[in-house]
Amino acid sequence: MDHLNKIEHIGIAVRSLEEGNALYTKLFGVLPYKEEAVESEGVRTSFFKAGPNKIELLEATNPDSPIAKFIERRGEGLHHIAYAVENIHAEMQRLSAAGFQLLNEEPKAGADNKWVCFLHPRTTGGTLIELCQDRG
């Protein structure tokens, strides 16, 4: 059985969602199709469609949020790669058993009507991986 075989979106950390939206609108030639806040994560997000691909921009709304800490340490740029999964609980169990460190023990409500779980970059070769399942 194939696992993690479809990229759901690519997440990019930005200091300013307005500036990021302007930049990526110029780059892709389209406006973001969605903007929303995820209060529990301390972020505002916007989503772009670039052909078959989705790009998520993330701006911190809380200085203690993971995005604020990421930008403080690394600056703006690629934050995570998200993979679509059909059963997030089963994938979390499979990946945990395979030695990957989950950053949350249960799926959390994320942006774009998804259940999400992140894998620690220490266990994925330095890349933050997000699992995404439609909340339906």
What are these regions (language model features)?
Residues 38, 56-69, 102, 106-118:
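Intrinsic, low-complexity N-terminal interaction/targeting segments
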Residues 19-20, 30-32, 54-56, 63-66, ...:
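Short loop/beta submotifs within extracellular cysteine-rich repeat domains
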Residues 7, 24, 48, 55-58, ...:
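Short, structured motif recognition centered on aromatic/hydrophobic residues
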Residues 15, 49-51:
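Short strand-coil-strand connectors
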Residues 2-3, 46-49, 83, 89-136:
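Vicinal oxygen chelate
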Residues 1-21, 76-85, 135:
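N-terminal beta-strand motif that seeds the catalytic metal site of vicinal oxygen chelate
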Residues 19, 37-41:
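Short glycine/proline-centered loop/turn elements that form peptide/ligand docking sites
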Residues 20-25, 95:
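Conserved active-site tyrosine of GNAT-family acetyltransferases
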